[in-house]
Curated annotation (Swiss-Prot):
It is found in: Secreted; Nematocyst. This is Delta-actitoxin-Eqd1a. Binds specifically to sodium channels (Nav) of the axonal membrane of crayfish and prolongs the falling phase of the action potential. It also increases the maximum rates of rise of both action potential and resting potential. Is only active on crustaceans. One of its GO terms (cellular component) is extracellular region. Belongs to the sea anemone short toxin (type III) family. InterPro entries: Neurotoxin_3_Actiniidae, Neurotoxin_3_Anemonia. One of its GO terms (molecular function) is sodium channel inhibitor activity. Its main location: secreted. Contains 4 disulfide bonds. It holds the Pfam family ATX_III. Keywords: Disulfide bond, Ion channel impairing toxin, Nematocyst, Neurotoxin, Secreted, Toxin, Voltage-gated sodium channel impairing toxin.
Amino acid sequence: AGGKSTCCPCAMCKYTAGCPWGQCAHHCGCSE
């Protein structure tokens, strides 16, 4: 449990517009 519940899949992190309901950042486990 944690903030990752609001994070988008790393595949979606490539285009933030594809995941408005979550976040795309390093703390989400993504490289972008």
